[in-house]
């Protein structure tokens, strides 16, 4: 076993040395793997080299030349051919590789000897090495590029051949070693495996380098032109290549050179690409920056629209296009055949010359003085101003679409024509045309759709609708009426047959009756009482007309025909709807006259309504005198005035009354003019006559009527003035006097007593103080005793209650402490400090956006909005909506003003 291990180690070390030698040879480029076959070829050549150029120029038809050329061609080798045979494999360090290779070489050598050796190569094709070296020097000087192109090819071919031979020798040596061992891979250490791997990787690297394309660093010699590039020797610079500076030296423009300098930079390799997640993040950031810059352009417009009080859409003004109409010409030259024909007609008629009008204007103003010219200019300016105003007014009125407005304007125009009463041929012609249209269309009849609907739905009962329909029928009659021509005979006579005003009214009434009969049988005017009233009015009008005609004829007027009739058996007295029947005689008439006079005297009212006279009348002794009149009625008279006082005493009492009670000092004049009710009372018994009873009834009726006419203020005043003595304050002198003095001193009261009587029992100040105290106690903090009775004590029979020392008192917080109230030092004020939580949502915690401070906001709230406090323009501005749009208008998106 020891011998076997030593042998394997020696073989492995030998294989390592072979592998190292092969690697060094490949790295150094030394391919000395020439075989015996090569030696034999070298021996036959005798130090000569085949002239390949000559062979390429020679005859290619001979078979020998073909064989020689084929021997120098680069062919693709199969794996079997590279290993030496199809059946046997050349394995690294195999013991069979060398024997196989020796057998193949011997066989090839025998075949070549049988064929007669190198018969395909002529002696003329051979050339000495010295000649080859001389040719290389010459070609390098004349045309270095061609030699450099050809020599690498030859070198590459030689290297390929040498590599093949070296690989074959290695395989043979390896095969010999493998033959000595039965299993070469059984006892291979790890170090040996690492060495083998290194050799294999080095081989692979060399193969990739050999297969890489060769780069030519040389160019053709000679001067550079449009067909030939400059040579490497002629190029400037250390690297021998054309640089950017060489190209920029030709340019004279400095600005271009400065811009080109930006292209200069050190070429560097690309960095390792970032992960996709980070790349997407960078892309999003870049996109956000671009979009932010684009959106920031609209910031000013958005802020302006937000701060604007009113926005009228569309914000973009519509583009106005000047469309050429059929009557306006855009150019002086005619564009169509029609324009050419029109120009031709104008030129033939001498109307197309604009200079002609200007000449006439110059001639008209040539003879004018400067003052006349200025006057004419002023008149023309005024005319143009008036025309402009009329045009503007006409455009404004034309836009009005109200039917009511059109109807009113039409009536006004017709009324003005009637008032003008100027008849001309044009008016007659217009009237004839309107009359013909009316007779043909019958527009102002009840045949129209509107009139039929009004009659069908019973709208004729409405006063306005009925009036409109009547006006329509009258308009139709006016349009159909003929124009009355005046004859010459009538003008000579001077007698114009006209009706009087009363007859015209009568005729109009008849026409209106006929019209109403056409309209229908319903309505207020067709009721019985309305018809009776119209009939009475008609009879009165007829009577008036008859009297006027009698006056015209010279007859007398009998105004009072009822005076001739005698009153036989009945005397009618108007007394609120009652009739009293008495025998018709002259005595009864006299009695009635006396009764009326007596009643008027009874109804006279005393003018003195002052409080002083009333008090004097109540306190002084009043005598009642009863008397009986001739008719048997007992009349009780109550004298309102007492005993007459002296003038001085009356004046003194008046002055004292004014000083004592100033409320009664300034009485209005109306109180003095009001009449006092009658103080006489008619006592009626069974024996009273009918006239007395009738007079009493008439007097009562008149009194009731007067009471109804009086207002509430007068009634209240009467009640105040007729107060009883029990409700009046009487002040008596405590030191006493006579009864007369005491009666006089009743009126001597003071103003304080009147106030005390007016506000008796009204202690307002005390009530206010009590209410304020109650409010303070309710809103103040309170202490509530929450101690429960019996809690913590003994109960039951024999238990004695103890005085409990500990009390549980809870303090309830009120609205505000009484010491911190705002009305603490204000005696006559109560300030409510309760907070209503329902009102908190209507209170603003901060000032709204447009306002800067609280004063501005409160000032805006104080400003009224209604039409009653502001002008029409201000009201419209205040209620104007913030966003206004026109119906049917296309709202396009905003156009960027910065483009």
Swiss-Prot record:
<feature type="modified residue" description="Phosphoserine">
    <location>
        <position position="423"/>
    </location>
</feature>
<feature type="compositionally biased region" description="Polar residues">
    <location>
        <begin position="619"/>
        <end position="628"/>
    </location>
</feature>
<comment type="function">
    <text>Involved in nucleolar processing of pre-18S ribosomal RNA.</text>
</comment>
<feature type="region of interest" description="Disordered">
    <location>
        <begin position="776"/>
        <end position="805"/>
    </location>
</feature>
<feature type="region of interest" description="Disordered">
    <location>
        <begin position="485"/>
        <end position="509"/>
    </location>
</feature>
<dbReference type="GO" id="GO:0005654">
    <property type="term" value="C:nucleoplasm"/>
</dbReference>
<keyword id="KW-0687">Ribonucleoprotein</keyword>
<feature type="modified residue" description="Phosphoserine">
    <location>
        <position position="562"/>
    </location>
</feature>
<keyword id="KW-0690">Ribosome biogenesis</keyword>
<feature type="compositionally biased region" description="Basic and acidic residues">
    <location>
        <begin position="36"/>
        <end position="45"/>
    </location>
</feature>
<keyword id="KW-0067">ATP-binding</keyword>
<comment type="similarity">
    <text>Belongs to the UTP14 family.</text>
</comment>
<keyword id="KW-0698">rRNA processing</keyword>
<dbReference type="GO" id="GO:0005524">
    <property type="term" value="F:ATP binding"/>
</dbReference>
<feature type="compositionally biased region" description="Acidic residues">
    <location>
        <begin position="61"/>
        <end position="90"/>
    </location>
</feature>
<feature type="modified residue" description="Phosphoserine">
    <location>
        <position position="151"/>
    </location>
</feature>
<feature type="modified residue" description="Phosphoserine">
    <location>
        <position position="35"/>
    </location>
</feature>
<dbReference type="GO" id="GO:0000447">
    <property type="term" value="P:endonucleolytic cleavage in ITS1 to separate SSU-rRNA from 5.8S rRNA and LSU-rRNA from tricistronic rRNA transcript (SSU-rRNA, 5.8S rRNA, LSU-rRNA)"/>
</dbReference>
<feature type="compositionally biased region" description="Basic and acidic residues">
    <location>
        <begin position="588"/>
        <end position="615"/>
    </location>
</feature>
<protein>
    <recommendedName>
        <fullName>U3 small nucleolar RNA-associated protein 14</fullName>
    </recommendedName>
</protein>
<dbReference type="GO" id="GO:0032040">
    <property type="term" value="C:small-subunit processome"/>
</dbReference>
<feature type="region of interest" description="Disordered">
    <location>
        <begin position="1"/>
        <end position="197"/>
    </location>
</feature>
<keyword id="KW-0597">Phosphoprotein</keyword>
<dbReference type="GO" id="GO:0030490">
    <property type="term" value="P:maturation of SSU-rRNA"/>
</dbReference>
<feature type="region of interest" description="Disordered">
    <location>
        <begin position="559"/>
        <end position="721"/>
    </location>
</feature>
<dbReference type="GO" id="GO:0000480">
    <property type="term" value="P:endonucleolytic cleavage in 5'-ETS of tricistronic rRNA transcript (SSU-rRNA, 5.8S rRNA, LSU-rRNA)"/>
</dbReference>
<comment type="subunit">
    <text>Interacts with snoRNA U3. Interacts with MPP10. Component of the ribosomal small subunit (SSU) processome composed of at least 40 protein subunits and snoRNA U3.</text>
</comment>
<dbReference type="GO" id="GO:0005730">
    <property type="term" value="C:nucleolus"/>
</dbReference>
<feature type="compositionally biased region" description="Basic residues">
    <location>
        <begin position="1"/>
        <end position="14"/>
    </location>
</feature>
<feature type="compositionally biased region" description="Acidic residues">
    <location>
        <begin position="167"/>
        <end position="196"/>
    </location>
</feature>
<feature type="modified residue" description="Phosphoserine">
    <location>
        <position position="668"/>
    </location>
</feature>
<feature type="modified residue" description="Phosphoserine">
    <location>
        <position position="738"/>
    </location>
</feature>
<feature type="modified residue" description="Phosphoserine">
    <location>
        <position position="34"/>
    </location>
</feature>
<feature type="compositionally biased region" description="Basic and acidic residues">
    <location>
        <begin position="683"/>
        <end position="704"/>
    </location>
</feature>
<dbReference type="Pfam" id="PF04615">
    <property type="entry name" value="Utp14"/>
</dbReference>
<feature type="modified residue" description="Phosphoserine">
    <location>
        <position position="500"/>
    </location>
</feature>
<keyword id="KW-0539">Nucleus</keyword>
<feature type="modified residue" description="Phosphoserine">
    <location>
        <position position="424"/>
    </location>
</feature>
<feature type="binding site">
    <location>
        <begin position="260"/>
        <end position="267"/>
    </location>
    <ligand>
        <name>ATP</name>
    </ligand>
</feature>
<feature type="modified residue" description="Phosphoserine">
    <location>
        <position position="488"/>
    </location>
</feature>
<dbReference type="InterPro" id="IPR006709">
    <property type="entry name" value="SSU_processome_Utp14"/>
</dbReference>
<feature type="compositionally biased region" description="Acidic residues">
    <location>
        <begin position="110"/>
        <end position="126"/>
    </location>
</feature>
